[in-house]
């Protein structure tokens, strides 16, 4: 499985914002009912981190009305030794911070 960040923006108007949240919460989907929201800070988006097989599967979690504006980002992690090896190939030796 792969890990993805799903970002779902919605309109900032209060009634549109509330309806967007209502759609997510009434879906019954574990992912949607556990979304994090930025509305209280003026960022009208929901975020979820999900472990699924691919981007299409991640997008299909999003309610259909919100899919066209959703952004799916594949996530990964790094370890310092891998970065130092890659840097050494490009510049001859790892850079020191």
Stretches with model-predicted labels:
Residues 1-97:
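Conserved, structured core segments of small domains
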């Amino acid at each position: 499985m792969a890990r993805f960040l799903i970002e779902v923006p919605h309109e900032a108007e209060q009634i549109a914002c509330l309806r967007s949240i209502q759609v997510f919460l009434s879906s019954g989907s574990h992912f949607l009912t556990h979304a994090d929201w930025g509305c209280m800070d003026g960022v009208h988006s929901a975020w979820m981190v999900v472990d699924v097989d691919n981007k299409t599967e991640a997008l299909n979690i999003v309610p259909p009305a919100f899919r066209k504006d959703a952004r799916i980002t594949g996530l990964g992690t790094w370890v310092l030794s891998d970065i130092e090896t890659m840097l050494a190939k490009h510049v001859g030796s790892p850079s020191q911070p």
